[in-house]
Regions:
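Acidic, PIN/NYN-like endoribonuclease modules and their adjacent C-terminal/linker elements
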Residues: 1-4, 106, 113-148
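Short, well-structured N-terminal submotif of metal-dependent ribonuclease cores
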Residues: 1-42, 54-65, 145-147
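Active-site neighborhoods of divalent-metal-dependent phosphate/nucleic-acid chemistry enzymes
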Residues: 3-4, 75-120
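Alpha-helix/helix-capping structural signal
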Residues: 14-15, 45, 81, 123
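Helix-adjacent hinge/juxtasegments
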Residues: 55-56, 62-80
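Short, hinge-like loop/turn segments at secondary-structure boundaries
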Residues: 57-61, 94, 133-137
Length: 148
């Protein structure tokens, strides 16, 4: 699993939660990894999930939305083709319970020709293969990776 570098990066929900919430156990590590990326993509479904999880951290979400609006992150809403692909990916990995959000993240990676994903979700995303058979390059620093 990689440490951050200047290459483009797709951000998953858990990574952004740790990036935004200063009291998170891995805040500094995810902040460093994400800040090093040249381009930081936020998938549309990740943004919705992030908003839900940050209900109690509204200031953090507001700061993030300002950063997103000024272009510090690249918002990447799913296309209909990407949603169809996300559903197919979720179906293919049904034994993992991957879900639409993670499926859309993989579909975005395929569409952009990227492999680097900042995530805490090692269990799900380490098992996934892109359409060409290659694995994602997970940029992780979790003290306690998601068990979901």
């Amino acid at each position: 699993m990689a440490v951050g570098s200047a290459a483009a990066l797709i951000c998953d929900t858990g990574a952004l939660l740790d990036y935004l919430v200063e009291s998170a156990p891995d805040h500094r590590l995810f902040r460093s990894a994400i800040d090093q990326a040249r381009t930081r993509y936020v998938p549309g479904l990740v943004l919705a999930e992030l908003d839900y999880f940050l209900r109690a951290e509204r200031r953090a979400m507001e700061r993030f939305m300002r950063d997103l609006a000024r272009g510090a992150f690249t918002y990447a809403p799913p296309t209909l083709d990407q949603l169809s692909r996300a559903i197919a990916i979720d179906r293919r990995y049904s034994d993992l319970g991957l879900g639409l959000v993670d499926g859309s993240l993989v579909a975005l990676a395929e569409s952009l020709g990227l492999r680097r994903v900042a995530t805490r979700d090692v269990r799900h995303l380490a098992a996934v293969r892109l359409r060409d058979g290659s694995p994602l390059e997970l940029v992780v620093h979790p003290t306690d990776p998601d068990k979901s």
